[in-house]
Amino acid sequence: VEGAAYAKFVKITDLLQFRGGSLRMDLSEPSVSTYLRFGYTMAIPEGTTFVENGWYYKRVTVSSPDDVRFVAYNNAMNNDGTVTANLVFNNVKTSLYKANFTEKAFVKYVTADGTTVEAVESVYQSRSVSEVADAILKHPMASKAEKEYANNIKAAIQ
């Protein structure tokens, strides 16, 4: 086969859409710990094959310039062909409620010509448990239970 192939440029925002930070209210008592979630909708270009997706994150309790690479294992497929994926920091203790958790997402796929591509957000997303609790308290659509949970988070901050 002869001919020329040209790269197709894809905007990263077409592949990775950050939905924000949230707290899992069902797994812990906020006076002790909570679960901080970073939510995404992810996609790959048409005509490509999905390999994996996940995140690069910074350690909160250990000072290191290196990122930790974490591959997602619990994606939810949406009817439109996109994937909902969440990075959850488990069992965040009250002493870390003001700490900034920092991550950036990636999605990896193979193009029709066999080229493997890993698309990574250019900037890190950063949230603290305290910031997410503040956002819940300010949100007009937050339920009474959500606001109570957020108030308990704020009360637990030392």
Identify the residue ranges that each predicted region occupies:
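Short, surface-exposed linear motifs at loops/turns and structural transition points
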Residues: I12-Q158
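Conserved "repeat-terminator" motif of extracellular CCP/Sushi domains
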Residues: V1-I12
